[in-house]
């Protein structure tokens, strides 16, 4: 198991499934990921529950409730790392090397527009030309001043913080937590009401979680993109997931959308929404031996919670010694 978990961590570290990749290429990488994980899912995974009407309803109705990370009691769960200093230094290196001035020079001469058209299409190139021609000279001069970029990096820092927070609150990704060890005193104490709850045993080895197949909203959902809901082992490391590149691309797309009314010019790693939720501290959490079910569904964005059919994967129930 430890060998597999090391291979899984290495796979996530080196693999990027870009949002603009050809379907054949992205499908190949998804299949590689599933072929690595599915044969290594333990026969028994356990979910500890307190005695509440919600837990009882899930059990009765054959559901697994997933939720956004912000609903977890641990406020540092799914907290990613972004290298703000690197971003700031990169921006000012570009500025100090005359990059901004050169950009404006090519705008004025028209040299930049064929490049934009080649990369992003004629429509965006025409919008860029129109914006440049309508920008007053005093505004252009202000953009060329170093104080503008100091203010820009300060505002960028605020945007980065907002995106880091959004990882925990974004309703596209919802989580359910499981463990390999039903006898863990730590898990009974913290997640089963201090031994007064219960634990459910699941066998997910043959669970065909292809998302849309089991989604109750599939007939009314306009987006039939595959939802790769499955279970993955948590990676215990004192190094958090470095989301610098993904978040900068997301922010850049956000800025470009506000300027050009276009979407997703820069590709984003689709595994970003997996990696963000699969890293936890080695020293504080390794004893949990946790696996996570990650649900990504575009038709379930109206709530912090989503119910996933358990497909009769429950094999046993264990009562805590203090259950009433």
Range-by-range predicted roles:
Residues 1-324:
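Partner-binding and oligomerization surfaces adjacent to conserved cores of proteins
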């Amino acid at each position: 198991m430890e060998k597999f978990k090391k291979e899984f961590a290495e796979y996530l570290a080196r693999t990027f499934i870009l949002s603009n990749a050809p379907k054949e290429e992205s499908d190949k990488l998804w299949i590689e990921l599933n072929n690595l994980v599915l044969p290594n899912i333990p026969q028994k995974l356990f979910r500890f529950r307190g005695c509440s009407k919600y837990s009882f309803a899930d059990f009765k109705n054959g559901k697994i409730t997933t939720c956004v990370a912000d609903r977890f009691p641990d406020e540092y769960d799914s907290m990613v790392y972004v290298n703000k200093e690197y971003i700031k230094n990169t921006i000012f290196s570009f500025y100090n090397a005359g990059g901004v001035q050169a950009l404006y020079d090519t705008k004025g001469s028209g040299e930049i527009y064929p490049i934009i058209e080649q990369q992003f299409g004629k429509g965006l190139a025409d919008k860029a030309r129109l914006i440049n021609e309508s920008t007053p000279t005093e505004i252009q001069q202000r953009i060329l001043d170093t104080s503008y970029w100091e203010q820009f990096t300060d505002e960028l820092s605020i945007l980065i913080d907002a995106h880091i927070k959004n990882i925990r609150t974004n309703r596209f990704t919802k989580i359910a937590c499981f463990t390999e060890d039903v006898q863990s005193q730590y898990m009974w104490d913290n997640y089963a009401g201090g031994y007064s709850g219960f634990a459910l045993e699941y066998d997910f080895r043959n669970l065909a979680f292809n998302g849309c197949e089991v989604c109750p909203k599939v007939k009314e959902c306009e987006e039939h993109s595959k939802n790769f809901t499955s279970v993955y082992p948590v990676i215990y490391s004192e190094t958090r997931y470095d989301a610098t590149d993904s978040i900068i691309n997301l922010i850049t797309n956000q800025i470009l959308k506000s300027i050009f009314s276009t979407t997703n010019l820069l590709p984003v790693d689709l595994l970003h929404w997996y990696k963000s939720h699969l890293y936890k501290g080695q020293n504080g959490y390794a004893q949990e031996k946790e696996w996570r079910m990650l649900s990504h569904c575009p038709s379930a964005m109206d709530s912090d919670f989503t119910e996933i059919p358990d497909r009769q994967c429950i094999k046993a129930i264990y009562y805590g010694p203090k259950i009433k």
